[in-house]
């Protein structure tokens, strides 16, 4: 249920974002269809993973930032971004990539006359995030037992794992055992960095570039986000056993349900193609488009450098769909401009 609610909320935020950016009924209607099919029928919504639960918060950040008008200060939207991002970061830390993209977009468009206003927004964002995260941490400590920070895997572990050749930078059990074998956190970090350096040096410059390109393909080539590799372990039918429920369960759970996988793959390839058009016709004078572009660039760089899993990209689907719809909208505007120019010449 939580996965369905999270997905539905993400669909609403994504569609509203597309409308805010394009004001095109046709493009917005198409986004409704794509979001409903691609997100609503994606098998990852039945798995209790943070990749799904963080969807509404990350898509809310997308909507709040893209709905702000340049001529208005938009403090309410900034507060919404802070709350949504803080909750999202607690669920999935990679939400911070979207926040960094916002900061970079604001800096890129910074003018001297806006320094005080930007500083005020940054104070609201930073202070609000600290307060919200503090409240969340206090609530977590009150409900759950204190976690052992020394036993937690740090970024060095995922950096090391992301450079292994055996699984092409994805999850590697040997690396997990190697990290767990060292109890001292500082020595563990030193070992992880040393292993990473050794692996990179063995690849060489061109070998490293090729390796990271392979990881980029691994992250982006599957419209089911590697469901057959990671998610199909969740194969036991639970809950209701009515005829309708069983058909619905078999639709999502069954490993031999090729139809939905083919549909998802077709939509995903179409989205990727339209994102390419978004990049081709990208206007760097558009702050919101720059934010979307930097967010997508950021998550892909993250997956290239650290551990790569296709499902880590699932939470950024609202950004992909929005970019795809902008790519389609830009193409329409370009075609319209060419037609108008021809008519004017005639």
Predicted regions and their residues:
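Transmembrane-helix motifs of polytopic, lipid-linked glycan transferases
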Residues: 2-22, 60, 274-278
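Membrane-interface anchor segments at the N-terminal boundary of transmembrane helices
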Residues: 2-3, 218-292, 296
């Amino acid at each position: 249920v939580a996965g369905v609610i999270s997905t539905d909320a993400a669909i609403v935020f994504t569609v509203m974002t597309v409308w805010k950016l394009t004001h095109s009924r046709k493009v917005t209607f198409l986004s409704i269809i794509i979001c409903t099919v691609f997100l609503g029928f994606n098998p990852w919504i039945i798995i209790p993973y943070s990749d799904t639960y963080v969807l509404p918060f990350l898509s809310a950040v997308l909507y709040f930032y893209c709905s702000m008008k340049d001529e208005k200060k938009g403090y309410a939207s900034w507060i919404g971004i802070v709350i949504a991002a803080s909750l999202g970061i607690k669920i999935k830390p990679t939400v911070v990539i979207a926040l960094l993209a916002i900061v970079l977009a604001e800096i890129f468009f910074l003018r001297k006359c806006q320094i005080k206003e930007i500083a005020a927004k940054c104070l609201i964002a930073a202070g609000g995030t600290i307060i919200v995260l503090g409240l969340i941490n206090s609530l977590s400590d009150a409900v759950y037992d204190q976690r052992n920070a020394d036993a937690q895997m740090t970024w060095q572990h995922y950096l090391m794992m992301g450079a292994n050749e055996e699984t092409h930078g994805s999850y590697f059990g040997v690396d997990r055992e190697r990290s767990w074998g060292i109890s001292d956190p500082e020595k563990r970090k030193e070992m992880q960095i040393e292993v990473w350096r050794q692996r990179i040096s063995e690849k060489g410059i061109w070998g490293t570039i090729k390796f990271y390109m392979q990881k980029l393909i691994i992250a982006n080539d599957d419209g089911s986000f590697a469901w057959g590799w990671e998610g199909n372990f969740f194969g036991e039918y639970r809950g209701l056993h009515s005829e309708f429920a069983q058909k619905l369960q078999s639709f999502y759970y069954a490993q031999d349900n090729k139809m939905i996988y083919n549909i998802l793959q077709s939509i995903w390839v179409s989205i990727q193609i339209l994102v390419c058009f978004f990049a081709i016709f990208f206007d760097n004078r558009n702050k919101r488009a720059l934010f979307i572009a930097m967010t997508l660039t950021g998550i892909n760089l993250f997956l290239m450098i650290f551990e790569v899993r296709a499902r880590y990209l699932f939470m950024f689907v609202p950004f992909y769909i929005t970019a795809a719809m902008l790519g389609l909208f830009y193409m329409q505007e370009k075609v319209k401009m060419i037609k108008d120019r021809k008519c004017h010449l005639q």
